[in-house]
Amino acid sequence: MTQLAIGKPAPLGAHYDGQGVNFTLFSAHAERVELCVFDANGQEHRYDLPGHSGDIWHGYLPDARPGLRYGYRVHGPWQPAEGHRFNPAKLLIDPCARQIDGEFKDNPLLHAGHNEPDYRDNAAIAPKCVVVVDHYDWEDDAPPRTPWDSTIIYEAHVKGLTYLHPEIPVEIRGTYKALGHPVMINYLKQLGITALELLPVAQFASEPRLQRMGLSNYWGYNPVAMFALHPAYACSPETALDEFRDAIKALHKAGIEVILDIVLNHSAELDLDGPLFSLRGIDNRSYYWIREDGDYHNWTGCGNTLNLSHPAVVDYASACLRYWVETCHVDGFRFDLAAVMGRTPEFRQDAPLFTAIQNCPVLSQVKLIAEPWDIAPGGYQVGNFPPLFAEWNDHFRDAARRFWLHYDLPLGAFAGRFAASSDVFKRNGRLPSAAINLVTAHDGFTLRDCVCFNHKHNEANGEENRDGTNNNYSNNHGKEGLGGSLDLVERRRDSIHALLTTLLLSQGTPMLLAGDEHGHSQHGNNNAYCQDNQLTWLDWSQASSGLTAFTAALIHLRKRIPALVENRWWEEGDGNVRWLNRYAQPLSTDEWQNGPKQLQILLSDRFLIAINATLEVTEIVLPAGEWHAIPPFAGEDNPVITAVWQGPAHGLCVFQR
């Protein structure tokens, strides 16, 4: 049998050099590491990794080639109270594997044991890593590098976006290839999108609980191999990487950036009753935050929490991010439950991973977006991330919904959110673009459901409607569910228009949820993470062309307003913004706090947003000048208005002079 040479301790993972493959694995507490390779017949061959440099185990297998399937068996103590759960009976995934062969099924053999180790061998059914070689012609690809102040983000699911699109070839619908199809790219361009933000594409597993109910993890926030693409989105698993890069190259040629939603807060190994795939068996004590009793700190709600203050885990996370930028040319990341990135265990702006990103010449140059919270004490960190990061602005989401959907909200609070939440983000040299404004996202109601449902309807998730938030700030306008009278449909449409206008004409970086622009509904499910079906797939045949045109016109209008595309904070008297009451006078202190929901926002001294969010038709006295409504608010008859606008109940209009 071929003997392993010592090889090199870097880089981590399996790397083919034309003559053989170098294997490296981090484990600070292992006593022995076996490389297990599998031939075409599934026969396993084991080799002890002979190299041991610090905490890196390594070896070189001569004559090994791309396509080789492999895994690891890691020997060490079984001491649960100390956080050690080594079990060499279990084949483990390389954390840096770039392709996985096999499925992560619910099987007792894929568990290590809870209090006592399960010594049943699982190599016959365990997924295997695959050695890959990287040859790809990027041609003249270059990142668009869209400035933050010109960025319009579109959050989408790879499968859900295109699976039902009638103009995309059936054989590629729901895949990476479909993202780069001319029909999809033309649609995004016409809409005005500059950045496509994809829900997780790194390989993930469905939780055993979901599998037992006949469901699956649709969103992908359950990662198992952070360097490998999820194969279900590929036409062929063997060509997934090239399919993904082809799509990115096509999107870049159209000037559209690609941002990946990435999960660096927990793994698919879940809690101590969860499956054993990789990290738990390689070095549980190093990779996870461990309590004094040996259990996990569950700061994510997913059973475990990655210890991103450990130097080796910081190196692992940094290498993962660099891989996606350097190998796939992605333009940025949205970090799920990003407060975990700053835990030491207290949240710190100078936490090791933040520092590593800031000091990296690659990662410091891409777009970085934080979901700025986790579920632990002190986990809500909106506004507290380092200056390189933009952040999801849930203050904006809640304020926009409360203002337009008949909840109490003072004008001052609404104006503050409209002005990029300067009270939250104007610190440490940050600019207005740091506020990622959103009204909806993948988790929560869609925009249409916000105006059709007062309550969540998550029964299909199998948890008796207990899952998902109850704080939706939604309004069904008098009838629970879709459909209704013409008057009801029109009132809901007006609310959708108002929310979209607030989102797309406010200061900050807007993020639009895919499907909101044509009225997609999840029938009241506000936590559709396990619904891989018509509930979440966008039905393009039912798309509202009128709403799509309205959204595109708003985005086009946004790009014409200097106050919205100049990335600087609005100051009193700078000509960017004036806040006026219904009589075109500056608002008094009392009006800011107690006045009716009537407001005029004058932007760049030429564009006026007139708002009447009350339930009564109200005369709005416009500022001096000749005003005319502009698309998408202008009708065929668009007379010049010089004095008064008859503001319909729950309405708004945008004028230019």
From Swiss-Prot:
Lineage: superkingdom: Bacteria
GO biological process: glycogen catabolic process
Molecular function, one GO term: glycogen debranching enzyme activity
Reactions accelerated catalytically: Hydrolysis of (1->6)-alpha-D-glucosidic linkages to branches with degrees of polymerization of three or four glucose residues in limit dextrin
Feature: compositional bias, Basic and acidic residues: 458-467
Record site: Transition state stabilizer: 443
Keyword Hydrolase: yes
Region of interest (Disordered), ranges: 458-479
Biochemical pathway: Glycan degradation; glycogen degradation
Alphabetized UniProt keyword annotations: Carbohydrate metabolism, Glycogen metabolism, Glycosidase, Hydrolase
Residues at the active site: 336, 371
Keyword hit for Hydrolase: yes
EC number: 3.2.1.196
InterPro entries: GlgX_C, GlgX_Isoamylase_N_E_set, Glyco_hydro_13_cat_dom, Glyco_hydro_13_N, Glyco_hydro_b, Glycogen_debranch_bac, Glycogen_debranch_GlgX, Glycoside_hydrolase_SF
Matches recorded under PANTHER family: GLYCOGEN DEBRANCHING ENZYME (PTHR43002)
Role played: Removes maltotriose and maltotetraose chains that are attached by 1,6-alpha-linkage to the limit dextrin main chain, generating a debranched limit dextrin.
NCBIfam families assigned: glgX_debranch, PRK03705.1
Family classification: Belongs to the glycosyl hydrolase 13 family.
HAMAP family reported for this sequence: GlgX
Name of the protein in its database record: Glycogen debranching enzyme
Species whose genome carries this gene: Shigella boydii serotype 4 (strain Sb227)
Phylogenetic classification of the source organism: Bacteria, Pseudomonadati, Pseudomonadota, Gammaproteobacteria, Enterobacterales
